From Swiss-Prot:
Keywords: Magnesium, Metal-binding, Thiamine biosynthesis, Transferase. This is Thiamine-phosphate synthase. The gene is thiE. The lineage of its organism: Bacteria, Pseudomonadati, Pseudomonadota, Betaproteobacteria, Nitrosomonadales. 2-[(2R,5Z)-2-carboxy-4-methylthiazol-5(2H)-ylidene]ethyl phosphate binds at residues 141-143, 171. It is an enzyme of class 2 (transferase). Binds 1 Mg(2+) ion per subunit. GO terms for cellular component: cytoplasm. Mg(2+) binds at residues 76, 95.
Amino acid sequence: MIDPPMDRIKVSGLYAITPDIENIDRLCEMAYHVLAGGVSWLQYRNKKANSRLRLMQALEIHLLCKQFQVPLIINDHMDLVMEIDAEGLHVGGEDTSVAAARHYLGRNKIIGVSCYNQLSHAIEAEKAGADYVAFGAFYPSMTKVDAYQAPIHLLDAAKKTLNIPIVAIGGINLDNAEALIARGCDAVAVSQALFSAQDIQSAARHFSKLFC
């Protein structure tokens, strides 16, 4: 097993994931309100953007994250992590392997992995040096309508088996997040329920209070 550096910040609390928005000003405004609301982690994810737009958006969002001292995780793109010196990378089950990502990024970057509903995948990811794993979707997701469905009792087994933080994802809102936290997840990853809220900052604040 590859041990991550012990001084690395542990993933916990509210983990926000940006929506597929092309307008930089609008996206940054939304990110600002999420950060001001107390989000602990922010993942930049934009499946519709080209490489130039991704770079421009990620640079601006990283500046905001630095103001609030919140780590920025980049979805999928290792080169973008290095180009803007983001704090970490999140990879999906069919993306770059943890071992390849760790070799490319080195030991000082955070690496998270989507494990869907597969505990065995999470065990292998931990052995390969992942800093956290994400399970879900636990509820129907508006962001990924074809997402794998994960049973809530998976969190019980994961908590007993893994030694790295566990993130719950998929259709999470203020009505169902507490049930996941009670089952032992360290963080909840939220996109739709945050960025589509009428008051983004207030929504982020309410999610964050669930961990207090």
